[in-house]
Amino acid sequence: MLHLHILSWVLAIILFIATYLNISKNQGGTPYFKPLHMVLRLFMLLMLISGFWILIQSFMNGGANHMLLTLKMLCGVAVVGLMEVSIAKRKRHEQSHTMFWITIALIIITMVLGVILPLGPLSKLFGIG
């Protein structure tokens, strides 16, 4: 399930940037905008379901840091919301650059939290998790 979660995160980030850039300020969305946005929503759904499943498994194992897991879950849900809001603002021709960069910053924070959690690569490298 962890590999599905990581794959959905990577593809969602790529699709988010592609969807965001496929909206012209003057003409609106390109012909590729709608399919990209729908596929992005699919991967966001996969990301949320797999993340929730990993959260439940980690809570049941008992050896995880519950506070960091909950913080990563909240950051992940916030990233999904910010992705949708920044795309919607860009589609309505409103100022969306700030929202885009806030989303990118929160994506980086969420990825750092994922790396240092017990199932992350740093924990496995040093034998912590």
Swiss-Prot record:
InterPro entries: UPF0344. It comes from the Bacteria. Keywords: Cell membrane, Membrane, Transmembrane, Transmembrane helix. It is a multi-pass membrane protein. The keyword Metal-binding does not apply. Belongs to the UPF0344 family. HAMAP family: UPF0344. This is UPF0344 protein SAB0838. It comes from Staphylococcus aureus (strain bovine RF122 / ET3-1).
